[in-house]
Amino acid sequence: MRDFLPRPAIAPATVWTFPTPRRARLSNGIELMIFELPGQHVISAHLVLDVPLNAEGRDIEGVATICARTLDEGTLRHDGDEFAELLETEGAGFGIDLSLSGLQAVLDVPASHLDRALELFAEAVTEPSLAQRDVNRHVQLRLAEIEQAQANSSQIASIAFRAAVFEESRRAARMNGGEPATVSQVTPEAVGAFHHDHFGPAGTTLILAGDFADDPVAVAERSLGSWRNDDQRRVVAEEPAAGMRRMVLLDRPGAVQADVRLGGFGIDRLDPRWSAISVASYAMGGAFLSRLNAILREEKGYTYGVRMNFGPLRTGGSFAVQGSFRTEVVADALAITRELIEVEQAPFTSQEVDDAVAFFTGVSPLRYATAEGVADQAATQVLAGLPDDYVDRSLALLRSVTPEAATEAYRSVVHPDGLTLVVVGDAERLADPLRATGFPDLEVRTPALEDTQP
């Protein structure tokens, strides 16, 4: 008979901490954040420009997106093909990321090639050619992208929900990349003017993360220290505001399933309730066996998956329960959802809180295991106005969340009887059941993009 060794005890994970940056400033005022990460031989560079989307003119919204997407199409020194070949020679990848709060230009490159690659990176950001043919091509690509979104039920629902949750005059209510009526008005001259007016060293932060072969401050100074723009205009980020509660059904005749968004105006990461609401939303609709998924997917079989997520902005934000459901069960699914998201009689439990905290604290070392992960988080913090120790502080607050705190934070934000509803599906089969379920003021509309606005 075989003797088995006793199962070893599993020790709790050690407390992990986010890397601490070394700060410096270039001669032109650009803030520099350096993360020394031994063994990370692919450097990640994020140039964060404080250019919120409300800097765009209302009639040419989308100009920031077109400008950003055209940066690497050629510079004043190198045409597009030559620039692409030079980047490839250095083993570098160039990308952009645009949000309501600002713009990021991103470079990933082997440490041994950082010096030359960062020079090319600086060229793209500071002196792009923004040629007419490239701008016009990206305008057409953006218009095609919008047309494709109009054919996707899930994207229609997300666009319409955004338009309903935020007050209609605010930039947050409209797509980051602009809409057909505004994108079609973007010209090469408008793109050039936007770059000239808003790209510059003032308010800009360069984040470098990795295992550096040379002094990163000196490398950054050589590449970006001479950048000047005396005409640069700073724009204060607009604060979003909540829209009026609405119930919208966007008609897709014959659709066999419907996409649902049920939510409202939310909070940002600087709100003292953020850690508790993160735990609560994970328990309600973040985990695979969350309250929503356990009933609507596992027990009822109404959907392949449903989730609740909070999307913070620099100020405020939004939250939503979202999922796709078979047409014949949409009304019942929403009735069940409204019951489940009410926690007055079913507060969050210790087990739910423990599971959420274990997830958030356990995934952090993996999420930030690479230079890119660290630099991306640092860029997010810069755009949101968060301190350098935000991750560590956030994890400490998460560990202190109690069931009572999670329940109270959730109840203070999520008011089941005051939520905005957007459904994209077959109106002929859905309108009456939805009204009977508790949405009497349901508006039935056609999901043309122009109709996603309040």
Regions found by a protein language model. Give the residues of each.
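M16/MPP (pitrilysin/insulinase) zinc-metallopeptidase core fold and M16-derived inactive scaffolds
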Residues: S44-D108, R174, A287-Y302
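Buried hydrophobic packing residues in well-ordered domains
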Residues: G29, L47, T65-I66, L87, ...
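An aromatic/glycine/proline-enriched structural segment found at the starts
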Residues: R2-W16, A172, N176, G200-P201, ...
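Short acidic/His-enriched helical or mixed secondary-structure segments at domain edges of catalytic enzymes
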Residues: L143-I159, M244-R245, L249-D251, A255-Q257, ...
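A structural supersecondary motif
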Residues: R261-F265, M284-F325, R445
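Acidic/histidine-enriched segments that form metal/cofactor-coordinating
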Residues: R2-D3, A9, A84-F194, P240, ...
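M16/insulysin-pitrilysin zinc metalloprotease superfamily fold
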Residues: E73-R77, L107-L141, A287, G311-Y368, ...
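C-terminal regions of mature proteins
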Residues: M1-T14, P19-P21, T205-G210, E352, ...
